[in-house]
Amino acid sequence: EVITANWRALAARGRPGTETAAVLKADAYGLGADRVGPTLRAAGVRTFFVALAEEGVALRAAIGPDPAILVLAGLLPGDSEAFRDHDLVPCLNSAFQVIDFEKSLPGYPCAVQLDSGMHRLGLDAAELEAALPALTRLRPRLVLSHLACADTPDHPANAAQLRAFASLAGRLPPAPRSLAATAGILLGADYHFDLTRPGIGLYGGLPFAGARPAVVLSLPVIQTRDVAPGA
């Protein structure tokens, strides 16, 4: 109930026409994707993100065949059958992954992640140039990136990444775009594009108006002491 309420609160902040997905990586941040996934699906989530293919396999078993499941790590060695057999979509993060994907899963859908300035995952401008012919053939179903400093709303990197993402994505065939995770949603409509990807905010981990914590830490006090100053 709490996680669903947080998702709805974040979805309500999206600009009109923007889809709100849900990030369930690391077993829904340790809360159990097998429980959180079906709950969010019933609330209306149509697109889920996980970190690894094995997480996607487990989530597919929990939520059924219809919602899209995208894997943020992309296509790793030995994962081709998992993607094909469980209808998972890799987020391709490098020119190598693009080449490997085209060979391993020809005709299969993919997404592509761009490095707009965080320097963690994604193709930078040079890699995009090298991979552009293959990506033009593949026609990714989603183009995404991630903000490095969205937790600091007035950080100049946010606007710089917004411009860089728009420029890089504009070189690809037309496709829906996604830049904002939870903190990006809170930056405002310019960052929302076609799809937002709240993760930690679903669980109350990043405070916003209307947010509710999904977990509460409580513990007994075992012992107290009086300590003199300087002791």
Regions found by a protein language model. Give the residues of each.
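Ordered, amphipathic secondary-structure segments that act as subunit-interaction surfaces
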Residues: 91-93
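Active-site loop/helix belt of alpha/beta enzymes
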Residues: 13, 26-43, 96-109, 114-228
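A charged N-terminal "starter" segment
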Residues: 1-89
